[in-house]
Amino acid sequence: MSANRTVTVFSSSAEDQEPIELAEDSLQNLDKMLAEEKEEHQLLKDEVVLLRKENVEAKTYSTLLEIMLDEAEEKASSAQETTSEENNLKILNRDLVAENLELKEMKEELRKIWLSDSKKFQEALTRISDENTKLQKDCHELESIRQCAQFALDNCNEELEKTQTENEEHESRIETLEREVCEKDIAMKDIVERKDEISLQLELQTKEFTSALNDLMYGREDTLKQIHQMKENWKVKQNEFEVEITKLKSQNDYFDSERLQLTDRIRALLNELSDVRLELGSTRLAMKEKAEVTEAVTSFNKDLRDKLEDEIARLGECLQFRKDEHEQDEAVIAHLEEQLKLGSDKAAAFSSEHSDTIELLRESETELMELRMENYDLKEDFKILKEEKEDVNRTCECLREQLSTTIQERDIEKGQMQSEMDAKMVAVHQQYAKQIDNMKYNHMLAINQELIKGQMALESGKKKHANEILTVRNELEQSNAAHQSLRDQCSLLLSSEDDLRTAHLALESKMTLVSEECIALRVSRANAQKEIGNLTEHHKLEVALLEDAKSGIQQRLHYATIEIEQLKKINEVTQAQFKKETDEKNAEINEFQAAMVSMKQQYNVLGNHCRVLTSQGISDRTTIDKLQETIREHTELAIETKRIHDAEIVQLNDAHKKLVDNLGVEELDEEPKASTESEEKAEWEMVDEE
């Protein structure tokens, strides 16, 4: 089961890694596309910068030309002092007019260039906007890919949570097993302690039992010795008693014999008495004598009887004393037997307890063996679970590393995108700010230059007018006689004043033109500001879209967390199904592996077949090349033969014409047939040659 579980974990991890790898490949491709588009965008930016530089250079060139025109006009206005110089000034004026026309043409050309550059700039702006739209589309695609990757990450998170729940289950099982192992270890320790206590109790009981047995054995030996002594004494006493009894029996027998003899004598005497009574008279004396003798004998018998009765009483007392001693001995023996029975009962009880303790020890040993086997099995299961846990932890670590790497990559990509967007925003702001600043600076420079030119022209005119007035005053003070000359000079001065006025009017017209150009520049500046505002609004919209996307991502993450919690709840229900599915997946994986092996074999076969086909193709190509060469040779031969045949046909036609000119109609009818036959023969020869 552990191997199956590890296989399922690795299979699930391998199945989960496929969409992650696809997402990573797609992200890498998109990164490459973004890098290429960034390069193109940078090239466009460089082109725009170059165009702006050219525009600035053109403006500076136009300002320089205007300065040169102003200087030329100043020279022309200052060159009208003398008549000799007037011709030169006229020539210079013509040249300057020509140059002015050329400058106007150059201005028009520059305006055309400016218009073309502005069109190019607008086209570049449109291209930039198109690229921005493309970038937005790419961003949307990246967002969709990110969503797919997020979905894959969610799946990975779900599988991680499943693996974590399985790890928690394994850990709970391991904890329960550890608790059981600890409890069993505690029970083992208790059993060992009980065994030690029982062994100590057994040792103490065995010692007590051995000491009691020794005491009993010593007591038994003493009692046996006492009993043996008592038996020996009893035997001795019994022998003595038997001897005495035999003596008494012999005496009793003797007395019985004597009594029988006496009874026989008494009977004889009674018979004699009967005989004597029969002989009463005759024998009273003898009877009396015999009565006296009988009385003496009876008295003697009475004495003997008394003696016998005394001896019998004495013997009865001895017997009673012996009986009492025997009873005492029997009581002692019974007491000893009871003590022996008690000792034997104690020994039997102790032996039964010892046997019970031995059985308990055996049972405890069997339980210990069973517990050891269970502990060994539990240790093996614990090792297997540890290995499974390590495998699961490894897979979890791999998945976590993959997730962390993917999350880091996504964060890095997100940061890069944000940094790129910020950089784009900053670059756009900087570009347009630089453009605005450059335009402001250029317009201010142009306005300042025009104002400086006008002021310089006015100051130069004023200085010239003051110098002329001073010269006129000096001349008026010096020569009153040359009043006509002075009048002429005054007329000249008036004419110079008219020229100055015309120059002033020209300057005012130039100032109006400059003001109009300033107004146009202001309008262009306003348009540029509007474009900048539109771009800023566009970028603000992009930023708002990014913020909306961020909020949507955060909401999705929130919903994802809620779904993860729901999935955690559902995961507890689907664990049994997961086990079944893992078994089915293992079977499918095995089938897939077998199919992969078969596919690899087929792929190898196809590779070999492809190699054979490539070799055949190479050989076929060589044969085709040879055939093409032969076809080319045959075509060349056919072309040559056709050319020869055409030449022959031309010759035949010429010959036919000659024959027509020389021969009649009938022969003409036959000759075309011959010519057709010759042509058919020539064609068949061509076919045979081909």
UniProtKB/Swiss-Prot annotation:
Main location: cytoplasm
Region (Required for interaction with lgg-1): 381-385
UniProtKB keywords: Autophagy, Coiled coil, Cytoplasm
Disulfide bond sites: none
Disruption phenotype: No colocalization of P-granule components with lgg-1. Furthermore, there is an accumulation of pgl-3 positive P-granules in somatic cells of embryos. RNAi-mediated knockdown results in increased lgg-2-positive autophagosomes following fertilization and at later embryonic stages.
Coiled coil: 20-181, 359-409, 458-494, 560-643
Effect of residue 685 to K: Abolishes the interaction with lgg-1
Role, per record: Involved in autophagy. Thought to act as an adapter protein that brings PGL granules to autophagic structures containing lgg-1. Association with other adapters such as sepa-1 is required for the accumulation and degradation of germ cell specific P-granules by autophagy in somatic cells. This ensures exclusive localization of the P-granules in germ cells. May also play a role in the removal of sepa-1 from somatic cells.
Assembly and binders: Interacts with sepa-1. Interacts (via the LIR motifs) with lgg-1 and lgg-2. Shows strong interaction with lgg-1 and weak interaction with lgg-2.
Comment on protein domains: The LIR motifs (LC3-interacting region) are required for its interaction with lgg-1 and lgg-2.
Name recorded for this polypeptide: Ectopic P granules protein 2
Species this protein is from: Caenorhabditis elegans
Organism taxonomic ancestry: Eukaryota, Metazoa, Ecdysozoa, Nematoda, Chromadorea
